[in-house]
């Protein structure tokens, strides 16, 4: 479980996240293509030419970003979709359908071969999904000299809406003096 609390002194913009990598198939078990992902997200952020959110949201229906029903992560890797082609995998902010700020289960990641499963609980409005698209064998090695490789793990980074300060209607990330920032994300593991 990750719980974060902080208080602002001057007015601050706050949207903290984690950057944990998961491959439930196991260490050095190959790419995450066959892991099964489910997210209660109905939209993703649209991005400008500099890959910054442009204030618009894209409905996931009929796109490789629709994980409302569980499916293999790798199913979308070769999709004919502009952002998928540019990133070579997922590196997108997914917006949860329920924006109440309540803490509950928002998704899961599963390796059906081993039976390992991760359930994602959070009170955050979004999750950035990153599938290690930019990782390559020239990066520093993992433990025991094992080489890194593209799609070797997936990140589920709960967060506020990125660049929200510049887009009315996005998550409020302004923290004023005396206000408290308090958020909780839990990764529950099962086997």
What are these regions (language model features)?
Residues 1-9:
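Short, small-residue-biased leader/transition segments that mark boundaries at the very start
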């Amino acid at each position: 479980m990750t719980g974060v609390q902080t208080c602002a002194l001057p007015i601050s913009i706050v949207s903290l996240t984690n950057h944990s990598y998961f491959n439930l198939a196991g260490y050095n078990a190959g790419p995450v293509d066959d892991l099964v992902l489910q997210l209660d997200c109905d939209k993703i952020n649209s991005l400008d030419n500099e890959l910054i959110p442009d204030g618009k949201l894209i409905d996931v229906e009929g796109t490789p970003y629709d994980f409302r029903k569980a499916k293999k992560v790798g199913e979308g890797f070769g999709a004919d979709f502009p952002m998928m082609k540019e990133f070579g995998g997922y590196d997108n902010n997914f917006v949860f359908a329920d924006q109440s700020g309540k803490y509950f289960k928002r998704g899961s990641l599963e390796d059906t071969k081993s039976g390992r499963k991760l359930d994602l609980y959070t009170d955050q409005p979004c999750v950035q999904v990153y599938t290690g698209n930019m990782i390559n064998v020239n990066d520093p090695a993992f433990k025991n000299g094992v080489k890194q490789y593209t799609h070797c793990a997936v990140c589920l980074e709960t967060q506020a809406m990125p660049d929200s300060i510049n887009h009315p209607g996005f998550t409020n990330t302004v923290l004023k003096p005396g206000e408290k920032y308090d958020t909780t994300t839990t990764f529950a593991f099962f086997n």
